[in-house]
Amino acid sequence: MSSDDEINMDDSDSSQGEIDDGCMSDDDGIVLESREQNSSDYKDNGEPDNEVLNHDSLEAEMKKTITDVQAVLQVKTGVCRILLHKYKWNKESLLERFYEHPDTTTFLIDAHVIPRRQERLPAGDAECDICCSLGELSGLSCNHRACTQCWKAYLTNKIANNAQSEIECMAPNCKLLIEDEKVMFYITDPTVIATYRKLIVASYVETNRLLKWCPGIDCGKAVRVSHWEPRLVVCSCGSRFCFSCGHDWHEPVNCRLLKLWLKKCNDDSETSNWINANTKECPKCMITIEKDGGCNHMTCKNTACRFEFCWMCLGPWEPHGSSWYSCNRFDDSAAKNARDAQEVSRANLQRYLFYYNRYMGHQQSLRLEGKLYATVKSKMEQMQTLSMSWIEVQFLRKAVDVLSECRRTLMFTYAFAFYLKRDNNAIIFESNQKDLEMETEQLSGFLERDLDNENLVTLKQKVQDKYRYVEHRRKVLLDHCSEGADQELWVFNE
């Protein structure tokens, strides 16, 4: 194979056919999956407009974008995909930069897609620099060559083990990216080919700011929006998540504070708080000491120190005289500073645990109340046997849906409140939070304990009254949070 095969100018028709047979799907149709969404879930975003795309839909959409750009650039499909990847699949940005160059070759060189100097590879057999075998060598336009088996092994490793879709030349310090047509020429294993196709689609989603993978377990679909912003999106699998950060929908706390909160919950920062609150450092050598008895007369365990001090005031023990079990030394400034720092650590830990326990409490309730769907389903079936239609009994499922949304909102209000500076607006927020929490607990208790105690005549009215009021309280809280954000009323301590 000569280097002429690597010159990136080519007829669009032939290159399109080459990639269609190996790397891309033949299905040009875009399959869109949608699910009905509640406009009340959006804040100042209008009607929901996100679309759900499966793998074939993504691949077809990617092909269409490549074809549109290829018609202008007149380059191979694989080269076009590499360029679009570099520009995060923003074809307007790519074409704008393209028109700033005098010709296609200059543009490709500046984009590091082809080398500045392209040399024809010598014909005939030669020794492979990788495996030292003698035979026909092939390579890229950068003039780096190897035997077919070495290229195959290199590319297979990059795809199967390193999960790469943008693969550089195997030569050290060569940054030339290998186009899809060349990759597909060397790779013959159907499993590796399928993996490569999936990686290409994955890179398409991950570099496109208007696409986001659904975090649902084994979902495999992506959600597309018309414009980027932190917002609720709903996948056809039922997952509801934030388009900005990919986490479960977390209104009212924003993505930045949620990230800080989750890090605080998951890392060892609170272990450090516990150490600060329950241990002290030797005033002399600063080794950490945990008190394991009632006596306040402490001796440092460090054999090189053995300093004796008072646990209460952290001052030297000797001046305490006979005060073996109490400390009356309150005038030492260094000891006072040590005690103050200790109290601050304890207070911070208690404050964190207050919000963390309530956050986790609502999270646990959300999981446990998932069982209510089975209870409600049984009740709905029972009611249908008593002459009520399927539509007439849907109020029970609606009640559980509202309960779940309120639990999720309450859970994240505690992350929001943890960072919120206390002022008049924070007091209003806490009042709304309290009202929502109280009404949510009442709805939960009714659904768990009182369904069977009500006759069918009054049950529907009571359930609807309860979930509508709870839904109203949730809206009041979220509207207040949204207005506060718009008017920049919230002050956070990070």
Curated annotation (Swiss-Prot):
Protein EC: 2.3.2.31
Keyword Signal: no
Name this polypeptide is given: E3 ubiquitin-protein ligase ari-1.1
Binding site for Zn(2+) 3: C214, C219, C235, C237
Activity regulation statement: Autoinhibited by the ariadne domain, which masks the second RING-type zinc finger that contains the active site and inhibits the E3 activity.
Span list, region Ariadne domain: 346-494
InterPro entries (UniProt xref): Ariadne, ARIH1-like_UBL, E3_UB_ligase_RBR, IBR_dom, TRIAD_supradom, Znf_RING/FYVE/PHD
Lineage: Eukaryota, Metazoa, Ecdysozoa, Nematoda, Chromadorea
Source organism: Caenorhabditis elegans
Gene3D superfamilies: 1.20.120.1750, Zinc/RING finger domain, C3HC4 (zinc finger) (3.30.40.10)
Annotated stretches, region: Disordered: 1-52
Entry-linked SUPFAM superfamilies: RING/U-box
Zinc finger map (IBR-type): 194-255
Amino acids binding Zn(2+) 2: C142, H144, C169, C174
Reaction(s) catalysed by this chain's protein: [E2 ubiquitin-conjugating enzyme]-S-ubiquitinyl-L-cysteine + [acceptor protein]-L-lysine = [E2 ubiquitin-conjugating enzyme]-L-cysteine + [acceptor protein]-N(6)-ubiquitinyl-L-lysine
ZnF (RING-type) intervals: 128-174, 282-313
Domain topic, free-text comment: Members of the RBR family are atypical E3 ligases. They interact with an E2 conjugating enzyme and function like HECT-type E3 enzymes: they bind E2s via the first RING-type zinc finger, but require an obligate trans-thiolation step during the ubiquitin transfer, requiring a conserved active site Cys residue in the second RING-type zinc finger. The active site probably forms a thioester intermediate with ubiquitin taken from the active-site cysteine of the E2 before ultimately transferring it to a Lys residue on the substrate.
Pfam families in the record: Ariadne, IBR, IBR_1, UBA_ARI1
Keywords carried by this UniProt record: Cytoplasm, Metal-binding, Nucleus, Repeat, Transferase, Ubl conjugation pathway, Zinc, Zinc-finger
Keyword Zinc attributed: yes
